[in-house]
UniProtKB/Swiss-Prot annotation:
Pfam families: BphX (PF06139). It comes from the Bacteria. InterPro entries: BphX (IPR009310). This is Uncharacterized BphX-like protein Bxeno_C1129.
Length: 139
């Protein structure tokens, strides 16, 4: 239970930080590091669309993060949040792989994010299994 609680708190805080990092006031600098050498057309409607899309991603992560933080109060009851996080990290990892290969994402940035996804997936699986084995012992 302790591992699941720590996982839910950590991912909750991480996803809330991601929400803040994807809001339009903070993405300009981020995009320059993520996509060096790519003309971002700052100020053009296409750039606003890109910022808006990232804000939606951030809102989704923030929502999962808020539920994870709430669920940390009773991890057994909110165990379903963990596979949601795992699935989110798998999809985001695939997106990062795509971005490295086809969307000119900086290799170093993409690899760092891939490692982060793998770490969250690993910890999530460990926490989920621990909760499952605890449930089996209490039957």
């Amino acid at each position: 239970m302790k591992n699941a609680r720590l996982f839910l708190i950590a991912i909750g805080v991480f996803y809330i930080i991601n929400l803040i990092g994807t809001l339009p006031f903070s993405t300009l600098g981020l995009f320059g590091r993520m996509y060096p050498g790519v003309e971002l057309h700052v100020g053009a409607p296409i750039f606003t669309l890109l910022q808006d899309a990232w804000a939606v991603v951030g809102l989704q992560l923030g929502a999962i993060g808020a539920v994870a933080l709430w669920g940390a109060r009773d991890p057994g009851r909110y165990r379903a949040v963990i596979p949601v996080v795992i699935a989110t990290e798998v999809v985001d990892g695939l997106w990062d792989f795509y971005s490295i290969v086809w969307s000119h994402e900086a290799l170093w940035f993409g690899l760092v994010t891939l490692v982060i996804h793998v770490l969250w997936i690993g910890w999530g699986l460990h926490a989920w299994r621990a909760l499952a084995s605890k449930s089996l012992r209490t039957l």
